């Protein structure tokens, strides 16, 4: 006896008609007739009286209907309960580069929370070095950082590419602009090593560094003429101060920025985290 047979039996019993039951279930009438007949054969007992007025339950049919109602109700509850258990919920701690947090992440995070309101999402911004350490220390579940990341305990997923550009408040060559003071995030900024190599190649030493706490502060500082900065092009394009700065391309070997999402290999993947990984795959499209 299968649950599908019980469902058909219940429908015929409630409707009192093969035709009406078939319409309600959106089944072919001959299929409903055959399934009822097979059920009676399996149980070796008549469940319905067939009359010109339709189908009427026998005593055995009345008895089976009570159990069919209970079984189908339990199956429905089990299905709903299982579906609910798969619904992502609970805390989800994500680390992110500030440039990612103000460009690509908000749109996807908003979409994610609209679909999964039971997830308690928190986003912590920092530089790549500190974010990797936060992942290793279990302070965040995963993080968007600049890659590639080479660490035995970490798994990484490619998210996107960006272009590192030099910005200034006036027109000129990149070589000329490198002579200006450089505006950076605090110590640990992921681009400092690149800048150091770039300046060494250009023969520039003892460059003045001015540190800022936020992306917008850096871009605003550049637009005000305080100096130059190296930033992802997407972050500059999305800034309200974009029209006040010039963008200069860097040599090809300095341009590429790969953004990856990292998490510990031994991290227990919750339903909320797995769903977020699925959202990351959407970011790639």
UniProtKB/Swiss-Prot annotation:
Main location: cytoplasm
Keywords recorded for this protein, A-Z: Cell cycle, Cell division, Cytoplasm, DNA-binding, Septation, Transcription, Transcription regulation
GO cellular component, one term: cytoplasm
InterPro entries: LysR_subst-bd, Tscrpt_reg_HTH_LysR, WH-like_DNA-bd_sf, WH_DNA-bd_sf
Keyword hit for Ion transport: no
UniProt-annotated location(s): Cytoplasm
GO molecular function: DNA-binding transcription factor activity; transcription cis-regulatory region binding
Cross-referenced SUPFAM superfamilies: Periplasmic binding protein-like II (SSF53850), Winged helix' DNA-binding domain (SSF46785)
Residue stretches making up the HTH lysR-type domain: 1-58
Feature: DNA-binding region: 18-37
Family per similarity comment: Belongs to the LysR transcriptional regulatory family.
Function comment: Regulates expression of the cell division protein ftsW, and is essential for cell viability during stationary phase.
Name of the protein in question: HTH-type transcriptional regulator YofA
């Amino acid at each position: 006896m299968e649950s599908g047979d019980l469902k058909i039996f219940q429908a015929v019993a409630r409707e009192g008609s093969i035709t009406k039951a078939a319409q309600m279930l959106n089944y072919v009438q001959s299929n409903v007739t055959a399934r009822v007949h097979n059920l009676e054969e399996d149980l070796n007992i008549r469940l319905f009286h067939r009359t010109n007025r339709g189908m009427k339950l026998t005593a055995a049919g009345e008895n089976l209907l009570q159990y069919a109602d209970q079984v189908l109700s339990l199956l429905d509850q089990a299905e709903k309960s299982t579906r609910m258990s798969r619904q992502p919920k609970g805390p989800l701690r994500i680390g992110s580069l500030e440039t990612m947090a103000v460009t690509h992440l908000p749109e996807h995070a908003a979409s994610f929370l609209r679909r999964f309101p039971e997830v308690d999402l928190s986003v912590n911004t920092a530089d790549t070095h500190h974010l990797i350490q936060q992942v290793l220390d279990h302070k965040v579940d995963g993080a968007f950082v600049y890659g590639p990341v080479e660490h035995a305990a970490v798994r990484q997923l490619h998210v996107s590419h960006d272009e590192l550009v030099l910005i200034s408040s006036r027109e000129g060559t990149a070589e000329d602009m490198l002579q200006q003071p450089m505006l950076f995030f605090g110590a640990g900024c992921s681009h400092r090593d690149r800048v150091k190599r770039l300046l060494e190649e250009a023969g520039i030493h003892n460059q003045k560094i001015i540190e800022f706490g936020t992306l917008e502060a850096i871009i605003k500082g550049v637009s005000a003429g305080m100096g130059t900065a190296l930033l992802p092009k997407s972050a500059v394009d999305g800034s309200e101060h974009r029209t006040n700065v010039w963008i200069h391309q860097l040599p090809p070997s300095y341009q590429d920025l790969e953004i990856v999402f990292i998490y510990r290999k031994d991290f227990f993947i919750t339903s909320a985290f797995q769903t977020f990984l699925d959202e990351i795959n959407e970011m790639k499209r």
